[in-house]
Amino acid sequence: LTFFLKFVIVMKMQLIDTHCHLYLDAFAGDIKSVMERASDEGVEQLLLPAIDSTELDNLLNLEKEWPKNCFAMMGLHPCSVKESYQEELALVKDWLTRRPFIAIGEIGLGYYWDKTFILEQQEAFNLQIDWALQYEKPIVIHSRNSVADCISIVKQHQHGKLHGIFHCFSDDISSAEKIMDLGFYMGIGGVLTYKNSGL
């Protein structure tokens, strides 16, 4: 008998974590093991959203330490929009002129913790969307308790060139359809399992 050996090439799926803040102090002691576990599970690339100037050095240092795996975003998180938000935005703009980033983020609106700076958050969101269009970068949107307003603002800027993801989406089907109509993706996380999730 002649045996024919068949070689089946199995390609391992490459996974990308589109949103992880691995540069925060909580990971400082075991970042190497975190990266090894991610690789063991097929997660080869990790996208790092910016928060504000207080974490910027840690963000960029992690990217420098793991240049084949970690890719930095640049932006001002809506929960960091406070009294000094204009200086923070100036820093974001300055960094965008210095080097390329994978995306503009984490930007958007956050009404869950504090509603003191809603108008300033909206101003910062609009401005950073303009920069995303200028630099032809996707945006990563924080929309906790603010999905309708985020959709409205994105819609005003959407002329076919704006794209990105609504991070940690937990709203209802109607909002999901509007987001898809805008050509955007949704990040689905554990929040979707909460009782008050709209899906």
Q: Where are the language model's segments positioned?
A:
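Mid-domain alpha/beta scaffold segments of enzyme catalytic cores
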Residues: 3-199
